[in-house]
């Protein structure tokens, strides 16, 4: 209907408010990715597909999202433990094997993660405290599929349990 327009999907949480179940990591990742995308300058007009439910749910402020974003690339100096702490603080869940958005795993000199807003899972290869390479991999068989120059690390969740977020969600 409008091929020059960028269509951006903003889903509602896939659970009921005050339910015992939390939204899935994939849904929260999609929402965070959209909120980050809307802050980027673009030459194309944007169309946001959403529901009234999604539009009225509380989320992180634009300032808070910008505060939590990190750009990582080969040559960047960040220790594996520092990165693991950053991922934990940004709502990522540590697992033995990465299968879905919002998960990460630390294995020796490798950190596997599936960042919010990314189409593929990533494998960071460390040499000491320096990122040596960033490769994509298939979560189904864990095999490397390519190499990228870097990526933007977004929060995995809108419900971060720090002081500011707890105040905002009340």
Go through each PLM region and give its residues.
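ASCE RecA-like P-loop NTPase motor cores
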Residues: 1-170
């Amino acid at each position: 209907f409008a091929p020059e327009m960028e269509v951006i999907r903003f889903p509602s949480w896939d659970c009921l408010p005050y339910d015992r179940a939390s939204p899935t990591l994939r849904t929260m990742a999609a929402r965070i990715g959209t909120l980050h995308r809307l802050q980027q300058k673009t030459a194309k007009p944007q169309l946001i597909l959403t529901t009234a439910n999604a539009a009225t749910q509380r989320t992180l402020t634009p300032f808070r999202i910008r505060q939590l974003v990190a750009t990582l690339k080969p040559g960047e100096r960040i220790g594996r433990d520092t990165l693991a702490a950053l991922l934990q603080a940004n709502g990522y869940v540590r697992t033995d094997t990465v299968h879905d958005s919002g998960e990460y795993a630390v294995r020796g000199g490798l950190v596997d993660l599936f960042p919010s807003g990314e189409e593929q899972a990533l494998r960071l290869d460390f040499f000491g405290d320096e990122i040596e390479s960033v490769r994509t991999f298939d979560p189904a068989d864990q095999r490397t599929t390519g190499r990228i120059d870097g990526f933007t690390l977004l929060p995995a969740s809108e419900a971060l349990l720090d002081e500011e977020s707890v105040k905002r969600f009340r």
